[in-house]
A protein has these predicted regions:
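B-type heme-binding environments
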Residues: 458-558
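Active-site-adjacent segment of FAD-dependent monooxygenases/related oxidoreductases
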Residues: 39-128, 137-138, 385, 395-397, ...
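C-terminal helical "tail/cap" subdomain of flavin- and related membrane-associated enzymes
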Residues: 83, 89, 320, 357-475
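Glycine-rich FAD pyrophosphate-binding loop
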Residues: 20-42
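Extreme N-terminal starter segment of soluble prokaryotic enzymes
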Residues: 1-3
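Conserved mid-domain beta->alpha element of the FAD-binding
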Residues: 5-20, 31-34, 173-174, 201, ...
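A short, Lys/Arg-enriched amphipathic alpha-helix followed by its capping loop at the start of a domain
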Residues: 15-26, 53-56
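Conserved FAD-binding catalytic core of PHBH/FMO-like flavoproteins
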Residues: 85, 109, 120-303
Length: 558
């Protein structure tokens, strides 16, 4: 069989390598719209669940010289960090070892890398199995190929590009990111990407420059990253500063995010990122951390960044299906997520590994393999996709007193909409010990909703106590009418909020400030269908309570 992959980013190249391992395909062609590999971005984390998959495919994250004989970056040289440091506003530093640096044979440590280094690692491995290598099932990468249209029949998919050329395959995979053209062509009704109202600056500082950092008054930093091979985090009410080493400790990656709902440049379609003025960035952080003793350290880091860029953080509501006929999606095209879990690239790698196993299991039965892939991946990827949204919630205005009362009654944050570090349980094996190659030998049942990804320690009795004390409307709705999607779409604001869950329409307008998930739920899903993200969330007791907010049954538009 022949494979077409749209997008030669990290997910696309990894998936090409993974599909070779299935033994099912004769050739793999990857098409990329840019003429040269993209260089935008700074640091990222290949976590254990992604690193072990890289080792499986012979992708060397640790070796090599980041600058080859010609002086061009060719990948390698990850930074294997030792600890995380949370630097609090009171000056207290809590340090935790970075575990899951498992046995050397596993290859499953945390690898913090420059994005370009990782991309070049992937390109290097792909070249080793290219058309001139003489291997079975070669991978060929075609640059400068911008997708224009798709057409599929029972036995073939045809991709046509803007230069007039075309390609045919038995399978086509969209690995073309959050702005996926494959997604728009095949699923035109999918929700558009959404700016989260969080802006971040990214940049790199050479090691010698980090060592020389000083506060504005010339004194040393309170916590200079040069003193610790760690990932440092400084959270504030409306901002979050993080830094960690990449390229074997040669560069410090600096990442600073802040809540900026009025940043007009990210509300349209102008782009995802822009070059930034270091002085502007430094001033932003100076204001964000005003009155905070960590401000001098943060502004020093901001001012030292070389060629920083300004990024708008976008996501998209989960949608139910990732495949149609012989066409499938992976990575950010299927499940774009914010960077709070450090799992974006790792989930794309997991997609590729699962696809390989599904085709190894089902052979030339493309639709069955894609359905199996969707079933094993949708539920897990949705966990990260949804939860990463809420990990930025601390940058927004404080929760309502009513919601805080609910949390106090529960005595811990048991709901999936809460900041991930505050949830019950601390076992991270569900993230890092997971092996995406294990897809089972039978088609799994369909599951919706990312709701059980840590062990819950809250007792059933305590949960029942919380549910029984949820706020009730003075006049419950009757739920005895029919509602169209067009009507629901009219109620799409924070102050007039209807939401669809499993073909029922609920009015969250009065309920939102008292909802355990917080008013953020209303802001994200007003006027929309939230079934793909909430489908299996609510318990029977919660559903009994929701009846009081039910407008009626969803019907097709007239």
């Amino acid at each position: 069989m022949r494979v077409i992959i749209i997008g030669a980013g990290m997910g696309g190249l990894f998936t090409a390598l993974a599909l070779r391992e299935s033994g099912v395909f004769k050739s793999i062609h990857v098409y990329e719209q840019t003429r040269t590999p993209a260089t935008a971005g700074a640091g990222l984390n290949v976590a254990p669940n992604g690193a072990r998959l890289c080792k499986w495919l012979g992708i060397d994250l640790d070796g090599g010289d980041p600058k080859g004989p010609s002086g061009a970056i060719d990948g390698g040289r990850a930074a294997i960090l030792e600890t995380t440091r949370n630097i609090g506003p009171d000056g207290v530093v809590s340090t935790n070892p970075i575990d899951h640096n498992t046995s050397a044979n596993d290859g499953a440590g945390f690898h913090h890398m420059h994005r370009l280094d990782l991309l070049m690692c992937l390109h290097k491995r792909v070249r080793e199995v290219g058309p001139d290598s003489g291997v079975d099932c070669p991978i060929q990468v075609h640059m400068g190929k911008r997708l224009n249209s798709l057409e599929q029949h029972n036995d073939v998919v045809t991709a046509t590009f803007e230069d007039g050329s075309s390609a045919q395959g038995d399978l086509l995979l969209g690995a073309d990111g959050i702005n996926s053209k494959v997604l728009r062509l095949v699923w035109p009704e999918t929700p558009a990407r959404r700016w989260t109202e969080v802006t971040c600056y990214r940049g790199l500082i050479p090691r010698d420059k980090v060592a020389a950092l000083r506060k504005a008054d010339g004194s040393p930093l309170d916590h200079n990253p040069i003193d610790s091979f760690s990932m440092d985090s400084r959270k504030h009410l409306t901002a979050w500063a993080m830094n960690y080493w990449v390229r074997g400790g040669e560069l410090l990656n600096v990442w600073l995010a802040y809540y900026e709902p009025n940043a007009a440049e990210f509300e349209g379609d102008e782009g995802d990122w822009f070059s930034a003025d270091p002085a502007e960035f430094q001033e932003k952080m100076n204001k964000a951390f005003i009155g905070d003793p960590r401000r001098d350290d943060v502004t020093a880091l901001a001012g030292a960044m070389e060629n920083p860029s300004k990024w708008g953080l976008y996501d998209r509501d989960a949608f139910e299906h990732w495949h149609e006929g012989r066409i499938g999606l992976l990575g950010d095209a299927a499940h774009p997520m914010l960077p709070t879990f450090g799992q974006g690239v790792n989930q794309a790698f997991e997609d590729g590994a699962a696809l390989s196993s599904c085709f190894k299991l089902h052979g030339a039965d493309v639709q069955k393999a894609l359905l199996h892939y969707e079933r094993v991946r949708h539920y897990r990827a949705s966990r990260f996709q949804f939860s990463s949204k809420f990990a930025f919630k601390h940058l927004e205005p404080e929760d309502s007193p009513q919601r805080r009362a609910i949390l106090k009654a529960a005595n811990e944050r048991d709901y999936p909409a809460f900041d991930h570090e505050d949830r019950a349980g601390s076992d991270m094996n569900w993230i890092y010990a997971y092996d995406a190659r294990n897809v089972g030998d039978k088609l799994p049942a369909k599951r919706l909703g990312p709701w059980d990804f840590r062990p819950h320690e809250l007792t059933k009795a305590a949960r029942r106590e919380v549910a029984l004390n949820l706020w009730m409307p003075p006049v419950p709705l009757m739920g005895d009418r029919t509602v169209t999607r067009a009507e629901v779409a009219l109620h799409n604001t924070y102050d007039d909020c209807w939401i669809i869950i499993r073909n029922k329409v609920y009015d969250f307008t009065e309920w939102k400030d008292r909802h355990p998930g917080g008013p953020y739920v209303a802001r994200m899903f007003a006027g929309k269908d939230a079934t793909a993200e909430f489908g299996e969330y609510h318990s029977p007791l919660a559903e009994k309570h929701m009846v009081h907010f039910c407008v009626g049954e969803l019907v097709a538009n007239d």
